[in-house]
A protein has these predicted regions:
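Soluble acyl-CoA-dependent acyltransferase catalytic core bearing the H(X)4D motif
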Residues: 1-5, 14, 23-428, 435
Length: 435
C-alpha cells in the first residue's frame, strides 16, 4: 500500500531536530514489569497488522513510499525497559521519559516504539512513539483502545493462525511499480480536474486562498520561542483539571468546550508574553488547531484524516470573560466561513506534487543525514532588539483530542494520567495538547 501525499509529507519534512512522531506518556498505577508488558503486546499484535509493516522508499523517489511487511519483525526491538534510580521524583521521571522521545524513529523497521520507565514508587511511565505518517491524533486514540482495556482483567483476544509474511519488493520492482502508477495517473488526468465543479467549490477555493494570504497580510507576533529554529531538546509539563469545571464554564458563559479550552490556553500564553514582550497591544497570536475530518467509515483506519484552522487571537492579557468572547467570535467566523473544509480542499489540490522533488529527503535518518549536524549545532535564539521580522507562520499548536471518558487499564494496571507530546519543528518551539 502506497502512502498518501499527506502521510508521505510527514516523512519528507522530518529532520533530526524535528522528528515527526506522535507520542503519549501513560502514567499507570503500580510497577508494570517488562515481562508482563511484553506478553500483553504479544497477545494483541495480530489486531494491529499495520504495526508489522515498514517503509520501503522508491528509488529516486519516483513515487511516494510503500508500506511493506517486515519479514524480520521482532517485537523485542519495539518494546524497551528503563529502570530509574531509587528516590527519583515524578518530574525527574517525566524529564527522563521526554528525553527518550527526542530521537527520530529508526526507518529500517516499523515506525513505532513503546518504552516503560520504572523506579518511581507506585507508578510506571509508558511512552508510546508512533510516526505521524502512520497515524493522526484521532486514529492514535482509537488504536490506544486496542492495547488498553476498560477492565483490569479482560479475556485475552484469541489470535488467528499465523500467516506467511510476504517478502518485501526489491528496488527494481518498487521502481517499476512507481513508473506504472505515474503513467496511470497521468492517463487519468482530465483538463477539468483542476477546475471547481460548482459554485460551492469555487467559494471554498477562494476562502482557502484568503486563509493562507492572511499569513502574510496579518503577521502574528514573534514569541520568544519563535525566534530561532528548534533544536533537538524537549521539555514537557502537564496540568490536570476536572472536565466538569470546563463544562461549568461553558454552561455559564456559552460557547463550546473547545472555545473554553482555547480561552484558557490563549490567555495563559498572553500572560506569558506579557512577561517577555514590551508591547502587546493590537498584536495577535496565530494558533494552529488541527481538525479531525475522519468520517465514520474511516474510523479505525490508519493514516491522516486531518485539516486545520488558524484562529488569530489577542496577544495581550484580558479578563477571562472578554477572552472567551474574543475566542467565540473568532471561532464562529472560522466556522461560518468553513475554513477547515477550505484548507482540506486546498491540501487535496496540492497532493499531486511530484515526489521526485523530495528525493533528497531519503538520506534523513541515515549516516549521510545533514540534519544531524544541524541538530548538533543549533542556531542561537535571536535576541530581542526591539524589532522582530514579521512572523508569517504560526506561534504554536493547540490540539484538543477527545480522550476516553472511562478508566483504562494496561496489563491490569490502571491508567492515572495521559500526557500528549506534540511535534515541534521549524521555528515553532511550543505546543499544547488537551486530552
Amino acid at each position: 500500500m502506497r502512502l498518501s501525499a499527506t502521510d508521505a509529507a510527514f516523512l519528507y519534512s522530518e529532520t533530526a531536530s524535528g522528528p515527526m512522531h506522535i507520542s503519549s506518556v501513560f502514567v499507570v498505577e503500580g510497577e508494570l514489569t517488562y515481562e508482563r508488558f511484553f506478553q500483553h503486546f504479544a497477545q494483541r499484535m495480530h489486531l494491529l497488522p499495520a504495526y508489522k509493516r515498514k517503509i520501503a522508499m522508491v528509488p529516486f523517489n519516483m513515487s511516494h513510499p510503500k508500506w511493506v511487511d517486515d519479514p524480520d519483525f521482532d517485537l523485542s526491538k519495539h518494546l524497551y525497559h528503563h529502570e530509574l534510580p531509587a528516590e527519583v521524583s515524578f518530574q525527574e521521571a517525566l524529564n527522563f521519559t521526554v528525553d527518550l522521545n527526542e530521537p527520530m524513529l529508526d526507518r529500517s523497521k516499523p515506525l513505532w516504539e513503546n518504552h516503560i520507565v520504572t523506579g518511581l514508587p507506585g507508578l510506571t511511565f509508558v511512552l508510546n512513539r508512533t510516526h505521524h505518517c502512520m497515524i493522526d491524533g484521532a486514529s492514535g486514540m482509537e488504536l490506544a483502545q486496542v492495547m488498553y482495556d476498560f477492565e483490569p482483567d479482560p479475556t485475552p483476544p484469541e489470535a488467528p493462525p499465523q500467516k506467511d509474511v510476504e517478502q518485501p519488493p526489491g528496488q527494481l520492482q518498487l521502481y517499476n511499480e512507481a513508473v506504472q502508477d505515474n503513467l496511470r495517473a497521468l492517463s487519468e488526468i482530465r483538463p477539468t480536474d483542476w477546475m471547481p465543479e460548482n459554485a460551492k467549490q469555487r467559494e471554498l477555493i477562494q476562502r482557502a486562498s484568503k486563509v493562507f494570504t492572511d499569513f502574510v497580510t496579518r503577521p502574528a507576533i514573534t514569541a520568544p520561542f519563535n525566534r530561532s529554529m528548534v533544536g533537538p531538546k524537549r521539555r514537557a509539563d502537564f496540568l490536570r483539571r476536572s472536565f466538569s469545571e470546563i463544562r461549568e464554564v461553558r454552561r455559564a458563559f456559552g460557547g463550546t468546550i473547545n472555545d473554553v479550552v482555547l480561552t484558557v490556553v490563549s490567555e495563559g500564553m498572553a500572560r506569558y508574553l506579557s512577561n517577555h514582550e514590551q508591547k502587546l497591544e493590537n498584536k495577535h497570536m496565530r494558533v494552529m488547531c488541527p481538525v479531525n475530518v475522519r468520517t465514520e467509515d474511516l474510523k479505525g483506519a490508519l493514516g491522516n484524516q486531518v485539516s486545520a484552522i488558524f484562529p488569530m487571537l489577542p496577544a495581550w492579557p484580558m479578563d477571562p470573560s472578554s477572552r472567551l468572547a474574543a475566542v467565540r467570535t473568532e471561532m464562529e467566523n472560522i466556522k461560518s466561513n468553513e475554513d477547515a473544509q477550505a484548507v482540506t480542499m486546498a491540501s487535496e489540490a496540492g497532493s499531486g506534487i511530484w515526489p521526485l522533488a523530495m528525493a533528497p529527503t531519503q538520506v534523513v535518518g541515515t549516516s549521510l543525514d545533514p540534519t544531524v549536524w544541524a541538530a548538533r549545532f543549533p542556531l542561537p535564539v535571536m535576541p530581542d532588539l526591539g524589532w522582530q521580522p514579521p512572523n508569517v507562520g504560526i506561534n504554536f499548536v493547540c490540539t484538543n483530542v477527545p480522550g476516553v471518558q472511562v478508566p483504562l487499564y494496561l496489563a491490569g494496571h490502571k491508567v492515572r494520567d495521559t500526557i500528549g507530546l506534540l511535534i515541534l519543528c521549524g521555528n515553532v518551539g511550543f505546543s499544547t495538547t488537551v486530552l
